[in-house]
Design a protein with these regions (language model features):
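Core transmembrane alpha-helical segments of multi-pass membrane transporters/permeases
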Residues: 1-12
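Membrane-interface interhelical connector segments
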Residues: 11-26
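Helix-loop-helix connectors at the membrane interface of multi-pass transporters/channels
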Residues: 22, 58-65, 94-104
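Hydrophobic alpha-helical transmembrane segments of multi-pass integral membrane proteins
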Residues: 24-63
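Alpha-helical transmembrane segments of multi-pass membrane proteins
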Residues: 28-38, 66-85
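Transmembrane helix-bundle signature of multi-pass membrane transporters/permeases
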Residues: 36-40, 55, 59, 74-81, ...
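Hydrophobic transmembrane alpha-helices that form the pore/transport pathway of multi-pass ion
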Residues: 48-78, 131-132
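Juxtamembrane and boundary regions of transmembrane helices in multi-pass small-molecule transporters
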Residues: 80-134
């Protein structure tokens, strides 16, 4: 997106690039974990995934990072879905919390958290398999 591309020549881009390069040399699982943490943290702070994911994807598909295109794509798609669902600022979580008259944080973390913990474990396994096959 436009906002993600605007961040490409900033200090954030260089810091993220060094973290992504460092973690990709250690383990694909560490890289996936850091991508999930970063995008989810940005989402919780109110920065939409459409700003963060293009920046991450651009860094993941660079020649310096030795991971496949399918692995990069899955990481970004899964992280977008996870961070959007866990963010209490997400419109869907706000609507649900108002309908059931419950705090948005409770809806995001307590109700969705158990489901997404199990899905995230499966996603780590899937990334591992994709990386081996690539």
């Amino acid at each position: 997106g436009l906002l993600g591309n605007a961040l490409l020549s900033t200090k954030l881009d260089s810091v993220l690039k060094s973290i992504i390069l460092w973690s990709s040399e250690i383990s694909i699982m560490l890289l996936f974990f850091l991508v999930i943490c970063f995008v989810t943290l940005m989402s919780i702070m109110g920065i939409h995934q459409i700003v963060v994911i293009p920046l991450i994807l651009t860094l993941l598909i660079s020649p310096d990072v030795n991971i496949g295109l399918f692995v990069s794509a899955f990481m970004c798609i899964f992280t977008w879905m996870l961070s959007a669902s866990l963010s209490p600022l997400n419109v869907l979580n706000v609507i649900i919390s108002r309908c059931v008259k419950t705090n948005g944080v409770r809806v995001a973390y307590h109700w969705n958290g158990k489901y997404f913990l199990s899905i995230t474990i499966l996603a780590f396994f899937y990334v591992f398999v994709l990386d081996i096959l690539d």
